[in-house]
UniProtKB/Swiss-Prot annotation:
GO biological process: cyclic nucleotide biosynthetic process; intracellular signal transduction
Pfam families: Guanylate_cyc, PBP_like_2, PK_Tyr_Ser-Thr
Region (Disordered): 1089-1115
Annotated signal peptide: 1-23
Name of this chain's protein: Putative serine/threonine-protein kinase/receptor R826
Organism, as annotated: Acanthamoeba polyphaga mimivirus (APMV)
Source organism, top-level taxon: Viruses
Localization, UniProt: Membrane
Active-site residues, as the UniProt record annotates them: 909, 1522
Amino acid sequence: MRLNSQIVFCIVVVISCLSMIECKMGSRIYCSGSLSSVELFSQYISNYALRNDDVTIIYAGMSVDEINADVYIADCSAYDRAIPQIYMISYGLIQFPIVGQAIVIIYNVPGLSSHNMIIDRETLGRIWTGNIRKWNDIQIQNLNPDIASQLPNETITLGYNDAYYLSISEIMQLALRNFSEEFANAHTIAGGKFGNMIPAKQGYAIDAGEASESRIDWVKNTPFSLSFADFATVYPRNVSYMHMYNKAGKLVEPNITTVQSAMADFKEIYTTNDFTIDIFDASGENSWPISWVNYISMTSTFQQADCIRTKELLDFIAWFYMNNEIAEIIKEYQYYPLDNTIKKIAIDNMYNVTCNGKVSQEHQYLIAFGSPLSIMASWPNTWASSMTTVKYYASLSDQAIELQKTFSGDFGITIKDFDKNKYLSSTMEDIGVSHLAAFNIVPAYNIPEFIGLNETLVLNYETIVDIYLGLVTNWNDSSIRNSNNPYINSLLPNKTITVVVQKVESDVNELFTNFLSCKSDKFNNAIGPTNLPEFDFVSNNVVYTEDVYGVGNTLVSTDYSFAFWPEPGIRLLSHMAIVQAASIQTSTGTIIKPTNETLSKAVDNKINSINRRDIEDGSWPFIAMMSLVYHQKTMQSFSKASALADFIYWTQFDDTAASIADTQGYYVASIHPTILRENLELLQSFTFEDRTVSKVANCIFEGTICYNKGTCNNNVCLCNIDREGQFCELEKTQSDTNIVTIILAVVIPIAFIIVCIICILVVALIFSLRFRKGISDDWEIDFHELELGEQLGTGAFGEVHKGTWRGTEVAVKMISPDKTITKDIERNFKDEVRVMTTLRHPNVVLFMAASTKPPKMCIVMEFMALGSLHDLLKNELIPDIPFALKVKIAYQASKGMHFLHSSGITHRDLKSLNLLLDIKWNVKVSDFGLTKFKSDVKSINPEKFAGTIQWTAPEILSEDREVDYILSDVYSFGIIMWELITRDQPYFGMSPAAIAVSVIRDNYRPVISDQLRSEVAPEYIELLTSCWHFDPTIRPTFLEIMTRLSNLMGDSGMTGMSSSSSNSSKFDYNSFGKVQQFAINRTDPDGIVQNSYNRTDSYDLGSNNSHSSITSDTNKSNKYLRQTNIQHPTGEVVVVFTDIISAAQLWEFDASEMKNATILYNKLVRSICNECGGYESLISKERNSGEGSFCLIFSDVQNAITFCEELQKQLVGVNWSPKLLEHPITAIEKDINGTIIYAGLRVRIGLHFGSTKINYDPISRKYEYIGPTVTTAAAVTTITHGGQIIMTEDVANKLSTENSNKPVCLGRVDIDGIPDSLVLYEYVISALIGRFFGGVTRKNASFVSNETSTDYDDMDTDNSTFSARVPHQAYQYHAAIENNERYLTSAGLCSWVINYDEIKMGEQIGLGSYGVVYRGKWKNVDVAIKKFIKQKIDENHLLGIREEIAFLKKLHHPNIITMVGASLKKPNICIVTEYMAKGNLRDAMRTCTPKLEWHQKIKILVNIAKGISYLHSFDPPIIHRDIKPSNILIDENWNVKIADFGFARIKEENAIMTRCGTPCWTAPEIIRNDIYDEKVDVFSFGIVMWEVLTCKEPFIGANFMKITMDILEDVRPKIPQDCPEEFAKLMRKCWHAKSTKRPTMDDVIIVLAKFCPDISV
């Protein structure tokens, strides 16, 4: 079947504007290209959108002929083959290779036991020539002896295509010409066309289409067929393909190794900048014989109004060359990245593209190769240049230098001694060698008994050699003991030494074998200098690693191991020294330890050419010098040369670069005066076309910068006051000094008078301005300039709202403390805001403005669209966050914190809620500063601001006198790192007091399970645990954290990274292209969390503004399609609605059972949907997801029908609870034959077919389908019975005629809300044919309910024929649907569910443990509305809230607050209760005049006790856990009611969002985190008794920890002397330390009643 040429695959990315700036239309790039590249560009574009959302990139896949016709409007074109050079020159084109791919031979031979037949080149050529026609030909049998007997005597039917010469069809023909001379001759005679050859002429070869997909489908549907296709298209499909013998005679299969081998075979041609070659039939031993490279081409001379578009296109190309993560992603789709040297040459070609006569690409990409070093991961990442990116690839030092010969790298790094004379050839005569750093190479060991020791093991040369030669195999060997002191010897274990050997060519191998060869003739004779040594070890004495970075990781993970390794690699392995460097004992007995000092001495010896073998002056004997090798005069552009010069200078003279080097254990080379002089002279002579390139070149003189007597500014020396000359090399003469003195003597007095006058005028002006209207800073604004929108969050210091300021979306933090804001507090607030507005850093939230006048004090910040890191981690719509992205998040957060600390600001409240993410997933630190202001406000109301315990360092919890807040921030960061890898809430289930006690007393931290340790990089775990170490001095600084995370980002044991980029990270969010697909595959979610920081992008299908849409003719139906990566369907789709009927009645019947049933139903729907290839649309804002209704999208009608049928059948088999089945709506029903046709939830299903509009949610990375098609499907569902499937005529028409079950026409129906009547069909499931709907049943069917058989008259319903047309006599279908069922998600009809629009919100009257409390009205009744702080509640937890509200609604007691109902729609989830006019007991007692009488106090306490007793009377008891005066409410008649009970889960989660209160009322068993019962409420009541008695606050003046420890140590509030003894005795019993000694609340009521006999009990 030939692919219709009119069908075009379109991939479109529509990028939303940054939220903090005005919305702008970004550049639009349109490229057309081959169909084989659709998936490749889909991955490129969707992942690039996460990096750059200011550009829209469109890729249209089409035939080659259509590509050629499209070149006049396309910005670029993608072909499967290179355009010949002659056409490139003639048309002014430039092309870039993209990826390597494989063409495979696909076949369909039924009955074979093997999926991979074997073919050779000649046999394949003879098949296509027509000389081999049968599958059982002897040549094919000989190649496949295992299946020879299975090969059929059937003709091989060939599927070919004769597309344009830039297609894979042409590549296939050219490859066959190389494979077989027979084919080449026949092909020439046929005019170079498959279609003119014998197989086509004789009818057993047909044109199977240009696209690989078409040929694959043809092969699958054609027995005994054979064709060819690109492997990327074949790989995910179930089709057999052949392995081949290549040109070298080796059997190979298509994969990254064999294709990259083929590319490498032509590498020398590529390095000459010839990208027009084919790579099929490569000669390499491992090369796949039909390999190919696809290309992207464009004009080299753009002429257009806006050249930004050209730059954006080139940036996109550079990105997919440079970004490591996208390279890993495309490998999964069988696209194979180019060799790094080829990428470098291709990138250099970008600078040949011009726009309007100017070079389009100004950004410089420096591509470097060299030995894998941690410093070359950290330096490029830290060197932040907006115009330059450094990309560093690991290689051998010799390879890095060799690549300089062909300009295949911009520079190389070598750690071997560099012999410049060796390379002074015609190709490298201008070689420059700049020494950058030096480091120790050490004998490293991992002996657990030595961890934490201040002393190190000592080894001599002979012992080290004997270890490597297998002569010393035990750590307790006498040769080791002889070099160490008695203490060390006492610790030496009787354990086998495991030697770690790098079984791959490496510089370190060569260096240490050379070193030992110089020290020992025995080693030299046995092994000798080599970069791949071969040792003769017993198997249990060695561990091999083939990773160039693997020795370090192996050492740290292998106890009792040993190896030579660079010291920086050891430092970066772990915070605690698990792997340590041994000291060396020289031949004279001198012991030398590897330190900075011994490294410095060794460098000095090396520079002064001292033979270290003969000199023992305390220098470390084995070091390596890291040198940068480059072309001094012939780099390929001035810009590249200048960028490299800047980088070299930065590494040697920047403080940050030096700090990184020092942290990792490197010696910056320019510390040494000789190297300093050499490096500066190299920079001075570094030129391009005789122009100096360094920005300090003109300041360099005699190996100094400005003679060390001035500074270099803009390449000019600014001399000290006593120096002059071009380089400050001259001292100023005395005469000059005298003249200056005379001039100064005259000028200064005059200048002084003028300055005085100016100062007086300025002071007067300032005084005038202050007097009239005060000082106005640039950032000071009037509050009325802000337009406030939805509330985003609530904290201890106020609310955060989304808003608009001067047309820009912003976040506005309202400061709302008590009204006692003093002038000093106001001034402190203004002073601190002034400092914060000066801070600018990409990882710190931008402070934009502030209003500092009470009562409308606020801060205006940039709006962070994705909300907090905490929300992201809790968002189960994003079920998988790649570890690499987690590391990057941590790295960006640490950068922000390092900046703050460097600016003199400590955070003091660092937590995941205060790390915000913008729309591009960049992390920024927020809620810092205002330290003085917060302190002032806390002093006003200390109980309200007790802190966020989970992230608080122990020294702060214990209120140490001298706290280093920088290191306490590091502690908090450690908790955040734990959150990142677990996505859990720290200390979940523990009270704040329990957390504090456990952290301080027991050194308790969040649990890191063994499984987690095995899944997460040990370097990450080590860094995390060091951050939260109890001893602050052990904790790293944020600079060290940055460095260690930077190295971790590269997955290196020794150095942490194989390649790096200053602008492009290894994990540029790209794996989130998979998050969207995986999110819909979760069949067991806890639910769905949505973020109130929300943006929605919308697009129409079929338009050029589609977001990553791919339109194709791939709507092929499989009976039961199983997918692991489900793309969202586009184009015309089937919309399926499922809905639970009578859900409200079931929730009213038993909320607990209905919650569990709904969770089972949700899991079942999602599981079957995934198996059938469906996509779950985000639900509309009118209803929550998971409450009974689903909107599912299918691209194929048959898959949709399969889903419907499977769902209805499997619902009957669910293990529903017996309690649920008691209800008539969910009871079991059987047909007359005893077959169960109903059980449990009744679900109705409606279907419609058509186009939709799609909204994209960037937070969940999912799509919402809307529009008339969706509305119609929903409307059809509302008139459908439970258990019934109804579809529109559009669906019925698309249903395959081969389907065994035919839909039954119900006629034309009018549906409310749908303008036109619809012809509807019912789909009848044969297994459930006995179901009865609306008085009509199918032929020969009836049902039995409640085990009793009831006969029904047979009805004539002819299902034998099917027609999608309306019958001639159309009749009206009247569905007998009750009014309350004409509503989807009927769970919303519960009596206690309130429409939020019916609530009128009033003033805020309080802030509870899980919500902000407002006064309001509902249906003209005064109510209190508690709006949940946490609105991002996942699906299952929201069902739990629904269950709890249903239960609480049934509670009725005069001393329990009455639950009116709840609104359950985000973002307005709230509960509504009766309104209590006098507020809470605490406030009432404070404001009560006159003071309460004894009788009143007893009455209040009795009523409180009655309320608690009522809660405890349930089985199991309802435990309040938070009894205190602020949760006891009073009405105008002093009636007491208990509030704030229930919702334990929500309270727990909100404990991290609001600052916890003091633990005055908390029972000791809760603080100890012990098991507790309802007696904890009795304890709290005892404290309340004391408060009511004294009208005072308990533990007044004590801090959080003091109160906590007092409670644990049985210290209680002091009882007044005039307190009645019986009352005091009851209090003591209530607050007894042992819960078993406390009375019940019923006992309490009886005792209290004795004090006032007139009170009824």
